[in-house]
């Protein structure tokens, strides 16, 4: 059914539109780092050390990207945004845990998780689950590439 609490937008996790998701995710450019203050803080610290010593993992942005795909009906086996969460407080479900794991992998290794096989998340012959995993992997990689402080930079 979805969460009864979803910030200033009423109606549960499924109430968000793609425009609202974009507003929540923040702009991603050189002047407005991922819509929150940590991006600027990470840049400051990395510049102070002259190299990348801290990176961020854009879990929320990956979730926002996946939610937009769910709205468009492009995530196999997933019908509602609320399937990404396990409760009204925004804790992630198994689906969200998989997305977060791929996002962490991409941020740590600086490599795309697309095509990564995780046996415990795959069932032999389950093409929907495999296609769903591919959607999660792609969202994770797009999120990590889009957030400048998620990848190692050479310009400090």
Predicted regions and their residues:
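Short acidic/His/Gly/Ser-rich catalytic and metal-binding motifs that mark active-site loops
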Residues: 3-9, 66-69, 76, 112-113
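Solvent-exposed loop/turn segments at secondary-structure junctions
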Residues: 1-6, 61-66, 91, 107
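Conserved catalytic region of serine esterases and O-acyltransferases that act on ester linkages
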Residues: 48-54, 73-156
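Substrate-gating cap/lid alpha-helix
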Residues: 8-61, 80-98, 129-133
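A contiguous binding-surface segment within folded domains or other stable secondary-structure elements
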Residues: 55-77
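Generic hydrophobic, helix-prone segments enriched in Leu/Val/Ile
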Residues: 28, 60-67, 140-143
